[in-house]
């Protein structure tokens, strides 16, 4: 957990970054790496993103990266997916004008879900609706993004043949 966040923090030492993770061993591992590398511009939160965004100030975010949220592939579980109209409304409220959301998943059907939900929300402008498969470059991207490191979940999805 957190390799992309760690790389981003190193690339942008003047940014204050906030990571959201529920997996406690992943948090511990990332905290250890941050301390070893003396990176001080990252804070971590161990509660669901929906609860965090409900508490953030309006217009307080300039960029949000959501990489490999649980795709909940079974239809009866789709209501558990992070990218939902209510969450997007919270996210929109927290973002300042011109802010960017970057998304990635290794599930093609979830990628389509993300694009459709972003496109339907009046507060977001879809920069690109291009969906690339895991074998494409950059891999598993949903919305146009800059260069980023491959995440553990992205590599796992590629090994398992997820599209």
Residue ranges and their predicted role:
Residues 112, 116-163:
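Class I S-adenosyl-L-methionine
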Residues 76-78, 103-121:
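Conserved class I S-adenosyl-L-methionine
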Residues 30-63:
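S-adenosyl-L-methionine
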Residues 23:
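Conserved SAM/SAH-binding beta-strand->alpha-helix loop
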Residues 81-100:
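A short glycine-rich, Lys/Arg-flanked "PGG" loop and its adjoining helix->strand segment in the class I
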Residues 8, 15-18:
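Short beta-strand element of Class I
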Residues 50, 55-82:
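A short SAM/SAH-binding and catalytic strip from SAM-dependent methyltransferases
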